[in-house]
C-alpha cells in the first residue's frame, strides 16, 4: 500500500479533531470581549487616558462591591433605560444590562419624550441588594432593586411623587436611619440651586417627611445639583456639582450633623486643563485602599463623556485630580497611573459594532420610546436585523417624534459607521424608507426609499427638528438593486460625511457635510430606521446584515 494513504479510522479521527478545534476556536472568538477600534482608554503600559469612556454617559454614579465596580448613568427617554456598566479597574468598562426594560408610565413613554425620563440616578449596595434611585422630573423619585447587577430588576416603585424632584441619593446611617438627599429642577419645581435631606422608611422605598433644606447655592454655587451622599470619619459628605454643566466645578459639603450646618469647599475645577466643567459623579475606593472619582465633561454634540480622577483626603476634605499649586483644589488629569487592583484585567470597552448574529440586540442599542415587538426581528439563521416599516405618528412633523429609531451613542470624536442594507418594500405602498441616521436636535440620513417606479437612494437633512421644522430630501440616484452599503464618517467637530456603495468597494460621497448637534441633554446618536407614512395591512422591511464602527 502507498505510504501516503492513511488508515481510514485515523483519518476520520484527524478530521474530527480538526473540526472540534475549529469549533473551540469559533467559540473562543464568539466570547472574545469587545475592544473598540476607535477609542481605548487603557494605554497598555499601566497608565490610562481620559476620558475613560469617550461616549455619552452623563451623570455617572458608581459603587464597589468586593473587587467589582458598577456604574449607572442618565438615560432620559431612551429604552432600555438605566444602563449598568461593570469594571474591574475603573478604566475598562463593559455594558452588562439595563435596569429598565421599559419606562413607566408605559403609555406616556410610548411616545418620544426628549429630555424627560431618567435623570441623574444613584446606585448603592445594601445588605445583599443593589438599589437604584432615579428621578423623573415630571413624576417623582423611583426605586428599583435587584440581587444581581445583571438583574432581574424589580418594577420601579414611587418613593416620592412630585414635579422637579431630581438627582436623589440615599444614605444608610450606622444607627439604622435612612436618608435621601436630592436637588430641584427649576423648570418643574419653580426653584433650583438648593439641596434637601429627607428621611426614608427602613425599607428605603418611601419618603417619611417634608425634609430640611440643608444648602442654598444661589450666591456661591448656582445650579447646584446631582448630590451624592457619603459618611466618613464622623462627617456627612454631600458631593455636588455647581456652576452649570459646561462651565461648573465640583463642590463638597460636610457636616457632623446630617441636617447641617454644612461647610463648603470647591475640590476640583477646570484650572488650566482642557477639561471644561469637570463635575458630577461618584467617589469610589479600591480594595487596595485608593480613592478615585468618576465624573463627566460636556462635549456638546459628543455628549457628556466620563473621566476618572485620582482623589486623596487632606484634613477630612477630598482633593480630586492633581493639586499642582497646593490651593486644595484639584484639576483634572489627561493621563495617569491606573488604579492598583488585586488581579490583572483584560482591556475591554462597551460594545459598538454589531454583526446581528444573536437573538437579542446588543446592549449598546436603544429606541427613542418604549418599543413594540413588531418593530424588529433578529434572524440568527442568516445573521441579520430586520426592521419593519412602522407608520410615523400622525402628529410627527419629522423624525424627532418617531419612536422606532434604533440608536447608539457616538463612541468617540472620529469614527466611521458602515452598514449593509437589503430593502424589501411593500409594493402596494410608496414612500417606505430605511437607512442610516445621525440624530439630534437636527438630523441627517441616507436611505433607500420606495416610489412607484422603483427604489431611490435619498439624502435627507432636517435643521431644528425639535422645533418641528420640515425635512429637505434630495434624490441621490435611482437604484437597480435592493442591496446597498451606507456609510457615515464623523470627523472632528462632529462633521459628518455620508456616502454609499453599490459594489461594497467604492464609496461615493453625498455632496453636503452635515454638522451633528446634541439632542435634549444628550449627545448626537447614530443608528438605523425603517418608516412609512401610510397605514396598510402589512409592512415592508429592511434587512441590515451588520453595523460596523471603525
List PLM regions with ranges.
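Bacterial Sec-dependent N-terminal signal peptides
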Residues: 1-33
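Carbohydrate-active catalytic/glycan-binding domains of CAZyme proteins
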Residues: 31-550
